[in-house]
Amino acid sequence: MNHADYGPIGLLVIQATSLCNLDCSYCYLPDRQKRRIFDLKQLPVLLDRVVESPFWGPHLSILWHAGEPLTLPCSFYDEASAIVREQTAELQEQGVQIEQHVQTNATLINDGWCECFKRNRIVVGVSVDGPEEIHDTHRRFRNGKGSHALTMRGIQKLQDHGIPIHAIAVLTGAAMEDPERMYSFFRDNGIHDLGFNVEEQEGVNASSSMQGISREKQYHNFLKCFWECNQRDGFPIRLREFDQITEMMIGGKRLLQNEMNRPYSILSVDSAGNFSTFDPELLSVETQKYGLFNLGNIRDQSLVAATQSETFQQLLQDMTAGTALCRDQCDYYGFCGGGTGSNKYWEHGTLASSETCACRFSTQIPVKVLLEQIEAQGVKTP
């Protein structure tokens, strides 16, 4: 494999801070109680590392994520945005599109944050798991108090300011019990762009409430009901799981790889400047088999030089082997492009593996549900 098989970098994930003001029961991050902050003096260095490499492409999304980004002040993102504009001016003149995104629990959003998002053109993603008792079962402050009320207050602020949002809901066993209520919650609260992340066995979250054949059947029925409710109302909600599959089906497209297993499609950087590629959930994770997944630090290692490291070569070898297994063994390969390394590692102990519980939830079951709907009703898709 040569550098032509790497990139382009479409997503740059930066951990602004390791600290999170919540203590969600299913979180995979081990150090979310520690306040480690990304020094913005590192940002020009990081952007230079991207630009000097052969891996940059026509579009770059910078995502502030991992920890709660809004535990830092608005001024942090004002300064970061100014640096991004200055450092990428030449690229933008060449037609490269640069965007900033933030993924937040929304509990800290007020008018000041909304103004910050608007003046810096930051796209906002919100984490909300559904109705209060479902959300608050897992998404709590460290004092045990639920976060739902403050999350919904933050969402309302965004809507009052006319800021579009997309939402991610982590689905746990409790959410499976009433799909119509889950659907109505998002519809009635004006959340029209939604993705489901099924609770995963990952990082310090050593088990999941969504494991087992019975849960897979339940999720199948959940998605079927969600689709039918959405169709009944004229598809007010764009559900990521169906959108991606529908686009591929209608266009006759299939994936050969995905950004989670292609080197330098994603670049992830922690608060200390350590970087990795492939799946962002692998960043700064220490394991018995691979050691740290990190490839180096932006201060003293270029992206190209990192590809010569023993760590990169081992990760690439096993990731490639795992992707090949998926391609050879799985009928759904064209819809997922070989799965995600973090799920393979946490479920099988190696990247050189194939089917996971996570891929059955994220790809196989949505494909089955959508095919059933098409066969039963004809192609009536949003």
Task: Mark where each language-model region is.
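Ferredoxin-like iron-sulfur electron-transfer modules
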Residues: 2-11, 314-321
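Canonical Radical SAM [4Fe-4S] cluster-binding loop centered on the CxxxCxxC motif
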Residues: 6-41
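Exposed loop/turn and edge beta-strand positions of beta-sandwich/beta-sheet ligand-binding modules
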Residues: 10, 58-63, 96, 263, ...
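Cysteine-centered iron-sulfur cluster-binding motifs in ferredoxin-type domains/subunits
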Residues: 16-23, 71, 325-329, 333-334
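Radical SAM/AdoMet-radical enzyme domain recognition
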Residues: 47-63, 72-201, 205-212
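Active-site neighborhood of divalent metal-dependent phosphoester/pyrophosphate hydrolases
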Residues: 67-68
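Radical SAM enzyme [4Fe-4S]-AdoMet core and its adjacent flexible, acidic
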Residues: 141-149, 156-268, 272-275, 280-298
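Flexible mid-to-C-terminal extensions adjoining Fe-S/redox cofactors in radical SAM and related proteins
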Residues: 285-382
